[in-house]
Design a protein with these regions (language model features):
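Flexible, glycine/small-residue-enriched loop-and-beta-strand segment within the central core
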Residues: 44-51, 56-166, 205-206, 210
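Short hydrophobic beta-strand element within catalytic cores of glycosyltransferases
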Residues: 184-185
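Terminal amphipathic alpha-helical/low-complexity segments used for targeting or macromolecular assembly
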Residues: 1-34, 119, 125-126, 131-145, ...
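Conserved catalytic Walker-motif region of ABC-type ATPase nucleotide-binding domains
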Residues: 37
Length: 216
């Protein structure tokens, strides 16, 4: 009897999941095959959101596709986004390339544009914000002076630790590692380990040395 009820419960779950995904497809620009989208997720302007195949979007995630472009948020193949992260194109765009992973409670603001490369890991509670408030005139409150925007580019195979902040205009090269808690205020080329507030280069990642050492 217990196994019978388990089968019924599993069947209902499969049917509900299928119907939920079909319902979402009515509104989204595109949702790829084999993508898992958990319930209790908030979407805004879903007709400007693309989710490719084999993605996992966990509960509590907020994705806002509002943009002046046709696509505000592009999520590549095999991307995972952990619980309670907030991704907002904010009239710009957020592009997350294939097989990258966004940790829990991250905030990505795409007002000035955010590009994240392939196989990149972003630790929990990281802020990636491509805009900032102006502060040119002391006679006008900062909140009324508008914003300035600069694109953020994060390369392929980058590992960003938890609790980092990436500021507008920053480019992080391929294969970089950003230590937890770092505040990245300027750009860095490929193959560096970076840490601190403000973040500075700590060492070069020498892949030829690593491979030769492992071979021995």
């Amino acid at each position: 009897m217990k196994s019978f009820f388990n089968i019924i419960r599993l069947t209902i779950k499969i049917i509900c999941t299928f119907l939920y995904k079909q319902y979402l497809r009515l509104f989204f620009k595109r949702i790829g095959k084999n993508s898992t989208i958990y319930p209790f997720i908030d979407f805004y302007q879903p007709d400007q959101i693309v989710i490719n195949t084999d993605c996992i979007i966990r509960k509590g995630v907020i994705i806002k596709g509002r943009s002046l472009n046709k696509i505000g948020v592009f999520i590549g193949k095999g991307v995972s986004i952990r619980e309670f992260s907030n991704i907002d194109s904010y009239m710009g765009y957020v592009h997350i390339d294939d097989y990258s992973a966004i940790g829990h409670n991250c905030i990505i603001g795409g007002h000035g544009g955010v590009k994240i490369g392939k196989y990149t890991m972003i630790g929990g509670q990281t802020y990636i914000i491509s805009s900032n408030h102006k502060f040119d005139d002391l006679d006008i409150p900062y909140m009324l002076q508008g914003e300035c925007t600069k694109e953020i580019i994060i390369g392929n195979n980058v590992w960003i630790g938890a609790n980092c902040t990436i500021l507008p205009g920053v480019t992080i090269g391929d294969n970089c590692i950003i230590a937890a808690g770092s505040v990245v205020t300027k750009s860095f080329p490929n193959n560096f380990m970076i840490a601190g507030n403000p973040a500075k280069i700590k060492k070069t990642i020498n892949f030829s040395y690593i491979w030769s050492k492992e071979t021995v």
